[in-house]
């Protein structure tokens, strides 16, 4: 059921007051894809009275006051994305459209929404209940961080928002514990997965360089970020604190990851999977076209790409739902009156991480000295695609389901490492679960740029492309990489797709026979990337990939990512050496234009 958004709904529920009021920068969509809805439904399922105020008018009290004041706390989120990312392009132009706003116009979410909403509440409720910040905007800005839009180091968002608590990461457990302890009159400052402000430093926590120090010294900023990044795994992380003037930001160790059973329970909650009627009157919400008939199979990501925030926010450990949980949800989708038989996506951050576990990580936490997929797939990971193969086969058997597409994209290096199931997974995918285009994200081909991104070298892409085309077009595999300059070929992975897999895929080619294509995603102007690198990519794309790429984005330095650290410091954190960083907006655009244009200039 929908959570109430108006006084009329409270009256209908015979509620005089709410325990928790959640405020968000997106339209209210009751869906498991929307973080504030998940938090709301988790709290409601635990017996708390929860309401939602979506995209309140920041120039009056009409919206922010319409549900009154909560008994326990206010929860504040900027929405599914950082509000500055949602509102501006990588070249700092205002975005005109918004997929998460009714009507599609980007005119309802303020810049720095978390700070604005928190101060809006303080304006109209002077001595109110605790303000709890959450969501990706708060999570990635919880310590001193580089802010691309102001080109400055900003202090923890807790200080600017004048809030009481911040919950970081996927915060169901922490938020529920806050509600329970506030209800019972208990202290909340010992809860894992939260940050708060203290007049004194805690004992036995690691001290980060002070805010004032990291503003003045890039080496201190790098030291701060490295320590912060290495203390995010629930099994190994220590508590942290950072001085901001006379006060201290305190970060408690993270909450344990949800178990698969706990994740199943969340997706079994009573989501309506639609826009709340109050917001439907304001127009269509474009995001519904994608999320309404899609399935999330897992959380977390093994990739740890330097430009991406998923590993920090969702975790570097993949937690997969049970097949039964996913099938149950798919059966619910099939019963919806507007379901046409097509599940638009079955996946997560990367579709083919479902069901793949690292036993070491489950018991000892994420490694401090290496990554799961970079520079090669770790031997401890033991990729096994059999769980997803079985899941996809089960989805096809559901009454009313015509197709279940895998649109999230896949990691071809992870597939390459699964010698036992590589062939059968590709056959399953191509024959039944690709809508015409399969997404992959090599991001670049220049060796140095890929290294700074934390992405695999290009040989894995070439191997994968050959096999995909052999299946779908009957092309002969190419034994040589044509059109690749020495810098691109240098340090390429020497791993090959297993020969047994290649033979099997060739055998299945005629039975599949579908005309399908690979869609490639690339990034321009990442730290370390030059115009010459983009010309190299342009040449490679035309000669080897046989495409003129259109899916190209200019790099945006997201708060609390290693790529953002490189952008600010102009230093490679792995070597300590200075790197080239393009910061001129016109030249960033030129890097993109080089590859999307029809000629190399």
Task: Locate each region found by the language model.
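Radical SAM enzyme core and accessory elements
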Residues: 2-5, 215-255, 262, 268, ...
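Conserved SAM/AdoMet-binding glycine-rich loop
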Residues: 22, 38, 57-58, 332-476, ...
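N-terminal pre-triad scaffold of radical SAM enzymes
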Residues: 23-28, 282-309, 340-342
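Glycine-rich beta-alpha loop elements in corrinoid/cobalamin-binding modules
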Residues: 35, 54-244, 249-252, 256, ...
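Terminal amphipathic helices with adjacent charged low-complexity linkers/tails
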Residues: 59, 188-220, 225-232, 246, ...
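Flexible glycine/acidic-rich beta-alpha junction loops that bind and position SAM and/or redox cofactors
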Residues: 82-91, 140-142, 172-177, 202, ...
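Conserved, mostly hydrophobic/aromatic
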Residues: 164, 266, 301, 326, ...
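Intrinsic disorder/low-complexity segments
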Residues: 201-203, 476-512
